Structure formats: structure tokens, C-alpha cells
């Protein structure tokens, strides 16, 4: 997959993530869990921010980002404005990082072993884009299901 295509996918879905967080009518519902829904929209948002900043920003872009995965799922009641700023900052990191790459870099081995074996940078970036889309769908469903007046 080309760098431009990857940038387009990340831009599209991080923009949709921002829209989903903005679309909660009741900001407190961003953090609601219910029955078998164990992850709130807010925690999934924090998870995506952490995941992308770690695997793209820190590992490829050499940013100083330090991931705290446990906090992504335990932190609560982060203001919507902070989540939105973090999403915007994450998109900037993705674009800055991908802009430093040449197409040939996509065929190099990704710097970390993530799934117990080596993989190309291209493969892992596609994985990260599909991981983003997967959780984006969960957040959309969370919002439509739980952001209702009762």
C-alpha cells in the first residue's frame, strides 16, 4: 500500500474518531459501560491514541511518546476537549511520521516484534489502520446504543 493511501486512511478515520467523540450528546456517556460492554467509547479512544502514538510515532517517527496501555483502559472522565486535542495531535504525528518515509521504507522490517514474528512496515501500518477502523466501529455503536435519554 502506498504512503499516500495510508495517510488518507489514517486521516479519514482519525477525523471520524473526532466526529464520534464530538457526537455524544451527553459528554458523560462517553465513559459509560453497561452489561457486557466493558470498554467505554472514551477508553477505546484513549487506546487508539496510545496505540498509534506508540507504534507509529515512537517506533517509526522516534517521538518521545511513552505508552501506558493500562491507563488507556482505566482512566475515566477525561474531558471531551482533551480527547479531541489528543486525536488532532495524533493525526499530526501520523502525518509528520509518514511524510518522512520513502515508499521503499514500507518494505523494511518493522522495528518491533509485535505478533511473535517479523513483519514489514507496510503490513503493520495496514494492521494499525484496520485496528483503528475496528475500534471506530465499536465507538460508533457505543455512542448510538448508550448515548440516549433514559
For the regions a language model picked out, list residue spans one by one.
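Extreme N-terminal tail/first-helix region
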Residues: 1-15
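Short, contiguous alpha-helical
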Residues: 7-11, 28-71, 112-150
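Charged, amphipathic alpha-helical oligomerization/scaffolding segments
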Residues: 12, 16, 47, 86-89, ...
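A short, ordered amphipathic alpha-helix with a cationic face
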Residues: 17-19, 111
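Charged/polar positions within long, soluble alpha-helices
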Residues: 19-22, 26, 53, 57-60, ...
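Acidic/histidine-rich alpha-helical segments that form the ligand environment
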Residues: 75-108, 123-132
Amino acid at each position: 500500500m502506498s504512503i499516500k493511501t495510508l495517510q488518507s486512511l489514517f486521516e479519514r478515520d482519525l477525523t471520524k474518531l473526532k466526529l464520534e467523540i464530538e457526537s455524544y450528546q451527553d459528554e458523560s456517556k462517553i465513559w459509560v459501560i453497561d452489561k457486557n460492554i466493558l470498554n467505554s467509547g472514551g477508553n477505546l479512544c484513549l487506546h487508539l491514541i496510545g496505540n498509534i502514538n506508540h507504534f507509529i510515532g515512537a517506533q517509526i517517527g522516534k517521538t518521545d511518546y511513552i505508552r501506558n496501555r493500562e491507563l488507556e483502559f482505566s482512566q475515566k472522565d477525561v474531558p471531551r476537549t482533551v480527547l479531541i486535542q489528543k486525536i488532532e495531535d495524533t493525526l499530526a504525528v501520523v502525518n509528520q511520521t509518514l511524510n518522512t518515509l520513502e515508499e521503499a521504507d514500507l518494505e523494511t522490517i518493522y522495528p518491533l516484534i509485535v505478533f511473535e514474528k517479523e513483519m514489514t512496515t507496510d503490513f503493520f501500518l495496514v494492521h494499525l489502520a484496520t485496528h483503528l477502523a475496528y475500534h471506530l466501529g465499536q465507538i460508533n455503536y457505543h455512542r448510538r446504543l448508550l448515548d440516549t435519554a433514559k
